């Protein structure tokens, strides 16, 4: 006897099969169906209420097919498997007597409703399922690749050439291509309220006018499910959309993926979803019955009740408080399900915890102020206001104004105000100039505080800030990144700009001078990219770059392009904007030019390019591969091509951020950056090229990290370690580095993001940690050789228990001894491992791993008292 089929969707079977079918006949059909894989799939699920008569009346006249089997659905999309997943299928094209290898287009376009939007309140800047799939698609290896193939081929020697080494080859004549898995480009066209009718009618304008995606993905959405009077229109529009993507007769070499919406904890909404999912599947079945070519071009991913859906989906932690939206864990699970269904047959599933962030909130407030110098980067949202001196705002007897003036007037020296303080609107910086020259080169320490006469400190504590700067001979070195100053002072056009300037001489003579000064506001009327965008309903953004933009080092969190997309849609109401990241790990200017048709020329009607190339060029320059002049030629050629392709577009051109990769090439780094910084000033480019100044950004970030540094020391190991903006042995930007990268883009474009959700986004994780002064009891770590199950046993001393002042996350890092591949699991506590250890067992059993278990505890600290923090690092390592 065949295994009984589990029926997953429901419909009023009597009404659907027609009123002429008797009850007895129906049950005969039903019982026969339970024994066959070709039985009707859509029958009543006893756990869900029957659909309303409205649904029945609307669906029945459509005459949609009902005999859809799970086996048949699984067989759809066969060409997707062979053509899209065959990463090494390349066509050779003769070019200048050489063979130019053309990679297949692996581009995806997602469309649907609000389910595709990463709202900040729910995800806190972390990835949604589309971005998780992007990570799998572009970073994780495919075991079906031919044996002996490497993940990446940087150089393929010239056709019929006897040159053997990289240095023998003229770089412009190289055959350079990245491993195809990195070439997957994913764009998200979803926005809240968008229906299938909207998608179909705007498909040419919103999608095809930009580029032609190899694969179009549609997720059945709430916007469509809620419209019970809509089914015939839905079928017609879905049919038309599929044909636009794969061809009227499925003749195009394109694909369509149908995602069926996940089950929710809202039974009434589940009823609507079930009907919509049925209609969508039946529409596909109708097309495949008419023309079998469609069956090879359409793939279905059933998140509603597919075999791969976790059994605890409704009872687990996959849904948000609204019972419908995905939680962070749910987003990860849906991304994983996509990867499982769409990957090559036999591919290893992504271990469930590998890149899943933990966003459990830590109470961050004045009572538990933490030291941001030691904590960064692992999934905790916090306010990054800097308060150098601890202030008890809750003390009813505390008066900030009195405290400030009592200190300031202690040794008051009366003097005229020698300083002019100007707020620079464009750069959002305070410019301080002195009318006097200090002949002795004495230094002055400055502090600002608001005039609180009309303010209530308890309502606006962030409007107070003490920060220090040093003045020597008219020049000021401000030791705090301007974003904090702006956030704290909160300077607005309609707000009084009367601030108190406190000056302290370092020689101890004339200890305090208090000057009741005015901050001037400089009006900047220079047109910005923001002015260009504000009248556009939809703006199209294209990132071109290397691993810094690709997202290497984010460990499952959002890269700068993904954060920008979230910010545009959440903070600025630009929910129709499209952000495409074409950046490729390892790319350089020669590679971009060589692959221009695939990298950037295929994208049309781009409004803003973000161009960030140079790190790998510098490294290859150091190897003697090519010259500075060739880099300059390549870069300007790319700019010319972009401008020719989209004359109306603006280019945000980044200079090169510091990285441990460039430690031996500092001279070249300065040469490249001098060249890049001069391009926006060149009359040939000044009208459309805008500098994204990463060098200045990281100099300021070093200062806010408490590191006294200048341009010549940006490659200092201490800075790369302590600044908490780098990952991957300090060669790439960490998740916090990507946040700053994104903020810098917003600033350059002209968005005022200071009061947005992203203004205070930051993450906590391992930083530059000192060895623990306290020894904790080591846990016992064992791995069962037969099952692969890893057990951790630990008796936690009472003093280490979690309390309101700290937390004890557990980090388990697995390092593959064959290829040094590393994955990290983040647990909230030791016992949490019990829930997941069996998921990892098959994975651990078949590979050779070194296992490091780490625990860190944060306690109450302040900026000035860093030694109060107790860190517990490596506990045990076991092979």
From Swiss-Prot:
Q: What is this protein called?
A: Uncharacterized protein MPN_407
Q: How does it sit in the membrane?
A: Single-pass membrane protein
Location in the cell: Membrane
* One GO molecular-function entry: lysophospholipase activity
Which PROSITE patterns does the record associate with it?
PROKAR_LIPOPROTEIN
InterPro entries in the cross-refs: Ester_Hydrolysis_Enzymes, SGNH_hydro, SGNH_hydro_sf
Q: Please state the protein's primary subcellular location.
A: membrane
Write down a Pfam family by its short name: Lipase_GDSL_2
Q: Which domain of life is it from?
A: Bacteria
Xref: PANTHER family: SGNH HYDROLASE-TYPE ESTERASE DOMAIN-CONTAINING PROTEIN, THIOESTERASE 1/PROTEASE 1/LYSOPHOSPHOLIPASE L1
- Which keywords are on file for this protein? Membrane, Transmembrane, Transmembrane helix
Q: Name one GO cellular component term.
A: membrane
**CDD domains from the entry?**
SGNH_hydrolase
Show the stretches that span the lipid bilayer: 14-34
Q: Does the keyword Membrane apply?
A: yes
């Amino acid at each position: 006897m065949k295994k009984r089929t589990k029926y997953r969707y429901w419909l009023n079977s009597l009404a659907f099969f027609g009123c002429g079918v008797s009850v007895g006949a129906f049950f005969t059909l039903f019982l026969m169906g339970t024994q066959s894989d070709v039985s009707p799939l859509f029958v009543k699920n006893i756990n869900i209420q029957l659909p309303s008569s409205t649904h029945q009346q609307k669906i029945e006249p459509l005459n949609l097919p009902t005999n859809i089997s799970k086996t048949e659905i699984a067989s759809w999309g066969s060409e997707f498997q062979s053509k899209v997943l065959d990463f090494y299928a390349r066509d050779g094209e003769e070019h200048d007597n050489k063979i130019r290898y053309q990679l297949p287009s692996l581009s995806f376009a997602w469309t649907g409703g609000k389910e595709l939007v990463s709202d900040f309140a729910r995800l806190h800047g972390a990835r949604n399922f589309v971005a998780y799939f992007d990570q799998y698609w572009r970073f994780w290896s495919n075991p079906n690749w031919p044996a002996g193939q490497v993940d990446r081929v940087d150089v393929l020697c010239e056709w019929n050439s006897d040159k053997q080494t990289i240095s023998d080859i003229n770089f412009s004549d190289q055959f350079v291509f990245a491993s195809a898995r990195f070439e997957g480009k994913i764009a998200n066209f979803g926005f809240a309220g968008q229906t299938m009718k909207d998608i179909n009618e705007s498909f040419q304008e919103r999608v095809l006018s930009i580029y032609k995606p190899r694969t179009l993905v549609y997720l059945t959405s709430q916007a469509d499910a809620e419209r019970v009077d809509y089914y015939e229109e839905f079928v017609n529009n879905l049919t038309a959309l599929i044909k636009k993507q794969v061809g009227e007769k499925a003749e195009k070499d394109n694909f369509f993926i149908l995602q069926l919406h996940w089950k929710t904890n809202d039974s009434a909404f589940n009823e609507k979803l079930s009907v919509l999912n049925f209609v969508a599947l039946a529409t596909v079945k109708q097309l495949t019955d008419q023309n079998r070519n469609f069956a090879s071009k359409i793939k279905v991913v059933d998140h509603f009740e597919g075999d791969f859906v976790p059994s605890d989906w409704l009872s687990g932690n996959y849904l948000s408080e609204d019972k419908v939206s995905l939680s962070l864990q749910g987003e990860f699970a849906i991304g994983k399900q996509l990867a499982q269904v769409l990957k090559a047959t036999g591919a290893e599933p992504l271990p469930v915890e590998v890149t899943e962030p933990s966003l459990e909130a830590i109470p961050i407030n004045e009572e538990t102020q933490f030291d941001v110098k030691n904590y960064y980067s692992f999934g905790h949202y916090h306010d990054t206001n800097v308060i150098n001196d601890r202030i008890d705002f809750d003390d009813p007897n505390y008066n900030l104004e009195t405290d400030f003036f009592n200190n300031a007037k202690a040794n008051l020296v009366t003097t005229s105000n020698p300083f002019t303080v100007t707020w620079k609107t464009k750069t959002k910086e305070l410019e301080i100039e002195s009318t006097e020259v200090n002949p002795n080169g004495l230094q002055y320490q400055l502090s600002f505080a608001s005039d609180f006469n009309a303010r209530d400190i308890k309502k606006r504590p962030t409007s107070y800030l003490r920060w220090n700067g040093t003045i020597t001979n008219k020049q000021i070195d401000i030791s705090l990144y301007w974003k904090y100053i702006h956030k704290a002072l909160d300077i607005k056009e309609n707000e009084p700009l009367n601030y108190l300037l406190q000056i302290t001489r370092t020689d101890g003579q004339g200890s305090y001078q208090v000057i009741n000064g005015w901050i001037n506001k400089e009006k900047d009327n220079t047109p910005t990219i923001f002015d260009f965008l504000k009248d556009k309903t939809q703006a199209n953004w294209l990132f071109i770059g290397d691993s810094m933009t690709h997202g290497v080092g984010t460990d499952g969190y959002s890269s700068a392009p993904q954060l920008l997309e979230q910010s545009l849609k959440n903070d600025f109401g630009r929910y129709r904007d499209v952000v495409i990241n074409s950046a490729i790990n390892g790319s350089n200017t020669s590679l971009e030019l060589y692959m221009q048709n695939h990298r950037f020329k295929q994208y049309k009607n781009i409004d803003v390019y973000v161009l960030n190339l140079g790190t790998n060029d510098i490294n290859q320059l150091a190897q003697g591969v090519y010259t500075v002049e060739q880099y300059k030629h390549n870069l300007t050629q790319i700019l010319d091509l972009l401008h020719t392709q989209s004359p109306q577009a603006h280019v945000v051109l980044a200079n090169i951020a510091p990285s441990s990769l460039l430690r031996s090439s500092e001279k070249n780094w300065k040469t490249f950056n001098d060249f890049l910084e001069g391009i926006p000033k060149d009359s040939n480019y000044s009208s459309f090229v805008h500098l994204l100044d990463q060098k200045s950004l990281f100099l300021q970030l070093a200062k806010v990290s408490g590191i006294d540094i200048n341009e010549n020391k940006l490659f200092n190991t201490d800075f790369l370690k302590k600044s908490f903006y780098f990952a991957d042995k300090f060669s790439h930007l960490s998740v916090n580095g990507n946040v700053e990268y994104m903020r810098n883009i917003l600033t350059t474009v002209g968005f005022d993001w200071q009061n947005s959700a992203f203004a205070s986004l930051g993450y906590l994780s391992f930083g530059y940690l000192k060895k623990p002064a306290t020894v904790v009891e080591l846990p016992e770590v064992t791995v069962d050789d037969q099952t692969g199950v890893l057990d951790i046993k630990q008796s936690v001393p009472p003093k280490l228990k979690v309390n309101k002042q700290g937390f004890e996350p557990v980090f388990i890092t697995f390092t593959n001894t064959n290829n040094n591949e590393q994955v990290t699991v983040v647990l909230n506590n030791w016992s949490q491992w019990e829930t997941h250890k069996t998921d990892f067992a098959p994975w651990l059993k078949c590979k050779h791993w070194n296992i490091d278990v780490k625990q860190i505890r944060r306690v109450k600290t302040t900026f000035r008292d860093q030694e109060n923090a107790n860190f517990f690092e490596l506990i045990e390592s076991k092979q």
